Amino acid sequence: SSTGDKDIVGYDWLMVDLDPTRPSGTSSSDAELEEAKNLGNKVYLALRNLGFEKPLFAYSGNGVHLLYKINLSNADERVALVKKCLQVLDMMFSTERVKVDTKNFNLSRICKLYGCKSAKGADTKDRPHRMSHIIGNPTEIKVTDIAYLEKLANLIPDEADKPQEYNSYSPSSFNVEEWMQKYGIQYKAVGCSDGTKYILDHCPFNENHKGKDAMVFRRNNGALSFVCLHDSCADKHWKEFRQFYEPNAYERREAVRQERMYHSFNRHMQPPQRAT
């Protein structure tokens, strides 16, 4: 029988696989491979800012690999953590032309042996077969502590804020695009694996943080998150982002919540009995 996840004792590596979008069964063009390398550099810089150690950097033949030494045991919560890290990287960095592979979380996943040829499809001038090889290897490969994996996973929480607008006592869905337009926030909307990514013109907390460094995410479940890739903004989340433009947003919501509770309580109160 083949080797399954249950047969593996743990993770040695977190493999971030950046794969160019191209016709099925074909090799990447030189331009597509260069785009994957450029995206790999962005992922590298962002994870270094987050506290990750230096990875092993390699060409797979058609895309780019960043391999981070992690040394995690085989446990359900560890698998869930690695899966979430790849999902967050996908939401943050995948483009229409290059995707972060989110399937590399399972323990029995195998990686290309560098030095082997990648021979997918016909070997043509525009889409040639290439040798996989290591681009960069740190002098000392250090283990990235689990705390930094958790930090990455928590950049986009599973249950982030779900703000609402209140009209009397009937809440309606919060329209984040209308809200950003109201406050003059410039953005570019891009679809991602679990909702929509809004790439901001700049971070409101530091206007020097620009060039896709600051983003708002709206997940399919309605949850909203704000992320700036710079370490100085690590403590800034959706709540702080919204309060930057709308300082009293959460105080108003709490006041409305208490008022609704008050009216609900009064409706269920029994009228006083008249004395006889």
For the regions a protein language model found, what residue spans apply to each?
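Signature for HUH/AEP ssDNA processing cores
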Residues: 1-62, 69-91, 158-165, 174
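Short secondary-structure junctions
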Residues: 53-56, 97, 182-193
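Flexible helix-coil linker/hinge segments at domain or subdomain boundaries
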Residues: 87-123, 160, 244-256
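Long, charge-rich alpha-helical interaction segments
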Residues: 125-173
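N-terminal single-stranded DNA-binding subdomain of primase/primase-helicase replication proteins
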Residues: 188-241
